[in-house]
Amino acid sequence: GATEDAYGVASTYVVTITPSETLGAVPTLTVTGGTITTAGAASSSDYVYTVTPSSADEAMTVVVAVGGAADSAGNTNTAASNNFGWTHDATAPTSTTAVLAVGGTGNGNHADVVTMTLDPSEAVNTPTCTFTSGGAAMAGTVTYSTSSPDSHIASVTVADADTNGAVAFSCTYADLAGNNIASAITSASSGSVTIDNTHPTITTVAVAGATEDAYGVASTYVVTLTPSETLSAVPTLTVTGGTITTAGAASNANYVYTVTPSSADEAMTVV
């Protein structure tokens, strides 16, 4: 139930002592971090003890000290047995914080990286996390990194095919002794991410003072762009045959520009 110089998670441990010869009595086992609940009994040439940890988390050792074992002639061991030590850990890790975030600006979209930063109550092994967006599994491979033994970051890159909607996740982990967290972490202590992979389009381009594919006679033209959704910045208008004298400004959901022809007679386009 225990690995030497590592961990054990058993509620009781069975300690087996193997002497070099037949003994005249049960050897004395010295225990730190626990108590002997069943005294040693001979099993063939071995002696078997049951040891109970003193607490849920305990550094433990067992050893047969000098003089702790004697043969039938009364000769005692002049050297202690190997000191077998381990850490008893019966406490499962818990989550202290779970922070969901995304790189970039605003909602997540193609090539942005979604991260879940996990801070458990103790050092843990690499977690296992899954991510969904809009209820469907995200296409990217989850990768893991650490900022400390008890702080882990799970990352997934947004794919263009990922479904629009809120990002959900499920993460589990185990401590270094192998104790699993009681239940998966499915809610963030802070942060939320929404995937928006819908590419905006310009649904209408209107030019006041001109007829498309015909003529215009204004000294300046007012160009109004209507996008398919709210934009995060003013769209770039390209003009041939003229210059933008007033940069685009938002007017409700539209963007308005003032364009001046380069000369008195000019073929013009805006796009």
Model-derived regions, located:
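Non-catalytic beta-sheet/beta-sandwich ligand-binding modules that flank or precede catalytic cores
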Residues: 1-271
